[in-house]
Curated annotation (Swiss-Prot):
GO terms for cellular component: cytoplasm. The keyword Disulfide bond applies. It is found in: Cytoplasm. Disulfide bonds join C240-C242, C273-C276. Under oxidizing conditions two disulfide bonds are formed involving the reactive cysteines. Under reducing conditions zinc is bound to the reactive cysteines and the protein is inactive. Redox regulated molecular chaperone. Protects both thermally unfolding and oxidatively damaged proteins from irreversible aggregation. Plays an important role in the bacterial defense system toward oxidative stress. Belongs to the HSP33 family. This is 33 kDa chaperonin. It comes from Synechocystis sp. (strain ATCC 27184 / PCC 6803 / Kazusa). HAMAP family: HslO (MF_00117). GO terms for biological process: protein refolding. GO terms for molecular function: protein folding chaperone; unfolded protein binding. The keyword tRNA-binding does not apply. NCBIfam families: PRK00114.1 (NF001033).
Length: 302
């Protein structure tokens, strides 16, 4: 099944629902960064969360950055997701592995840590980005992002995230975001019924692994709440904006002396993109061209 995002409403627009399947892009991230099992789960959950948060933005170039910094051995995570369905991200310590938790599941909370902060930056592509910071609740990602939504955006929300990774890689990943809009927030019976239904779920990936589609899951959860599934299915993908010209631009900033030193000692330079793991090689000729540009720019200022 292709990675995808679908939207729906229920209760006469009182409930907003968004679901994502991110199996393939999570597997791509696992391979690119050579992630451990628990690092795959942590990054996969965060990428799904980023796409779900970005889905509510309006401007075409809108993006969401989620940065998590806990006291666990994973170090930190950074995810960049766009309204256009693209996402990228990385983990500071990708090889960290932990024993399963008390429930026999991947110990994402232990890897991330419970003491720390979650930072969210919403950027619409112009003006000043909106940023918010909340303390981590559990390090399990889903609970932490839900805490952000309730605290910073003051929207009653339920967020389900899941990644199933085994010896053959990622076989199921995705998430579901349900939000009660202001028009329905005072309907205590509706909120209670929704909370009860969500409380009976054992997680998101079991639903995917049982063969259910996002529409099936929406129908199961919201079918008797006047569910209306929007027809558009948005495709999602792991995508990075890094490029060789950007690498050359970054090298140029180092200045002539540093570039000459690289030529003399290493016969060139190598750069690796943190977000996607792509390795770029700049040989001595590329660096010499940069030095020439620097010299010409200096001469023009005289």
């Amino acid at each position: 099944m292709a990675d995808q995002l679908i939207r729906a409403t229920a209760a006469d627009g009182g409930i907003r629902a968004v679901g994502v399947i991110t199996t393939n892009l999570t597997e791509e991230a696992r391979q690119r960064h050579r992630l451990s099992y628990v690092a795959t789960a942590a990054l996969g959950r965060t990428m799904a969360a980023g796409l779900l948060l970005a889905s509510s933005m309006k401007q075409e170039k809108s993006r969401v950055n989620i940065r998590i910094r806990g006291n666990g051995p994973l170090g930190g995570l950074l995810v960049d997701a766009g309204l256009d369905g693209t996402v990228r991200g990385y983990v500071q310590n990708p090889s960290v592995e932990l024993a399963p938790n008390a429930q026999g599941k991947l110990d994402v909370g232990g890897a991330v840590g419970q003491d720390g902060f979650l930072y969210v930056v919403r950027d619409v592509g112009f003006g000043y980005p909106y940023s918010s910071t909340v303390e981590l609740v559990s390090g399990e990602i889903g609970e932490d992002v839900t805490h952000y939504l309730v605290t910073s955006e003051q929207t009653p929300s339920a967020l389900l995230l899941g990644v199933f990774v085994g010896k053959d890689g990622v076989t199921a990943a995705g998430g579901l975001l349900l939000q009660v809009m202001p028009k329905a927030a005072r309907d205590e019976a509706l909120v209670a019924a929704l909370e009860s239904r969500l409380g009976h779920l054992t997680g998101f990936t079991p639903l995917l692994r049982s063969g259910k589609s996002l529409k099936d899951i929406f129908q199961e959860l919201l079918g008797d709440f006047g569910l209306a599934i929007l027809p558009e299915v948005q495709l999602l993908r792991f995508d990075c904006r890094c490029s060789f010209p950007r690498v050359l631009g970054a090298l140029k900033i180092l200045g002539q002396d540093e570039l000459e030193d690289m030529i003399e000692k290493d016969n060139g330079a190598e750069a690796t993109c943190d977000f996607c793991g792509e390795v770029y090689q700049a040989d001595r000729h590329h660096l010499a061209q940069l030095i020439g540009e620097i010299q010409r720019e200096k001469a023009e200022k005289l």
